[in-house]
C-alpha cells in the first residue's frame, strides 16, 4: 500500500514538476506580454492626453471666434477644426478599448474610461461621415445663433430680446406671438437633427455602445440603467413639492387671465410662465405672489438704482468668490470676455464660460441684461471659471468636474447665498426684511429652482429615447409635448404638428449640450449649500444662510474643486457633504416653510391639484 502510494506520489510529482515547468514558462510568457501591453497602454494614455490637450486649445479658440463672429468663414473654420478634434477623439476612444482589461493603476483605468465615454457627439470612423457630422453640427449652431423673429412692423428681434418680452409682457396675445415666432427658427433644423442622430449613433456603435443614449448615460461612475434609476429616485423625492407649486401657480394664473386663457385644471399653457421655454417661472412672481409676501425689494431695480452696468455685475459676482479665499480672476478675463451684445454682428448670446488654454485664459461670453436673473447667471458662469482654474494642476483628462452636474452646481451654490443679508453687506439693500417676508423670497426661489426640475429632467428623457430609437423622427414633436406634459404639467398654447420642431428652439438641442447635468445641479446645489452652511457654523434656517466671506467653507469647497475628475463623483461629493449619495432632501429642507404655506393656500382655495 505504502509503496504503491509512494510510486504514484513520485510519478505524480514528476508529472507535476513537468507540467509546472511548462505552466511557469507559459505564465512567464503571458506575464511578459501583459507587462509589455501595460507599458504600451501607459504610453498610449500619455500620448492621447498630450494630443487632446493641444487640440482642445485649437478648438476652444476656433469656437470662441465662431461664437463671437458668426459668418460663413468662421463657420467653415470651426467645422474644420471640430471635424479634426472629433476624428482624433473617436480614433483615440476606439484605440483605448483594447487596453480596458489590463491591470492598470486606478488613475490610468479612469483615464481610459473617460477617453472612451466622454465624446458627446461621436463621429463614425468613415471620414466622409465625420465631415458631414461636423458640418451639420456647425449649421445647427448657426441656425440658432442667427435666429430672429420679425414682427409685422418690421422689428426683428434676437432670442434674448424676445425672452425679455416673455419676461415682462402680461398680454396673452403678445406672449403667444413671441412664443410661436421664436419656434419658427427651429423648423429648418428638423432634417439636420435627424441626420445628426443617425451619424452620432453610428459613431457610438463604433465605440462599442448600443447607441448614443447608452454612451451619454455611461459617464456617471455607474451602469447606464442604474443612473436612470437614480434620476427617478431623486425626482420622486422632490415631485410632491413641485406638484404643490404647480397647483398654486395654475390657480393664481387662472384668477388673473380667466378660464379661456389659463384653465383651472390640466396642464398650464407654456407661454404664460414668464420664460421662453417655461423652464423657470420667476418672472411671474408678481402675478402669483400674495401681497403680504412681498420682500420689499427687487434686485433688478436695486441694480439700476446703484448704477450697476454689465461689468460691475460681473465684478460683484467675482467678489463673492474672492471673499471665500479664491484668487481674483486674471486681467485677461476682463480684456477678452464678451459682456454686451454687439450691435454690428451676430453672436451666440447664450451665456457660457470658457477656459481657452486649460490654465488661466478664463472668459465668459454672454449678452448681459441688467436683471436679477442675469445677476444670478453671472454667478453661475463664474462658478465654471473658478472650478476650471481650481483643477488646472490635474492631468488634462481629469481637468473636468467630478460629474457634469457638479460643474453646473457650483455657481448656483454661491447664488443661493445671495440672501437679503448679503445684499445689505454689499450695499445694494438698506435694510434686511424680517422672517415674515421669507415666504415671498422662498416663492421667488421656488419659481426659479423647483419649477426647473422637471424641465431639467425631461430634455434628455426625450433625447435618450430619440437616440435609442424609442422615439422615431415621425414622433419628435408629439413625444416632446407628451414628456413636457408628463413631467412639467405644461402644454403648447396652440396646436403643434410634426412640421414643427419645438425641441430645436432650446439652445442645448441644436448645440448638442447634454441637459441632465442641470437637473443634477439643481439637486446638488442645495446639498452643497446645506453642508457649506454647516461648515460655516450657521445654525439658522438654511434658506437664510449666506457663506459670503467664510474662508473655512471656501477652503472645503476648493478641496473638492481641485480634485477635478480624478476620483469618482461620490468621493468628491463626500469631500464637502460627508456622504457619497446625492440626496434631494436638502431641497425639501430649504423649501419646507414654503411647502407648508403652498398646501395651505391650495386647500383654502379648494384647488384640485394634478393634471
Question: Where would I find each of the regions flagged by the language model?
Answer:
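Active-site recognition of the HExxH zinc-binding catalytic motif
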Residues: 373-389, 408-412, 462
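C-terminal, non-catalytic "cap/extension" segments appended to globular domains
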Residues: 25-41, 72-74, 113-115, 211, ...
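C-terminal motif of bacterial Sec signal peptides marking the signal peptidase cleavage site
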Residues: 20-23
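N-terminal helix-rich structural modules
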Residues: 26-195, 213, 506, 513, ...
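Bacterial N-terminal signal peptides that target proteins for export
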Residues: 2-12
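Active-site-proximal, well-structured secondary-structure segments within enzyme catalytic domains
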Residues: 154-158, 195-365, 435-445, 451
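Post-HEXXH active-site segment of zinc metalloproteases
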Residues: 213-214, 218, 388-413, 427
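Post-HExxH zinc-binding segment in Zn-dependent metallohydrolases
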Residues: 231-241, 401-438
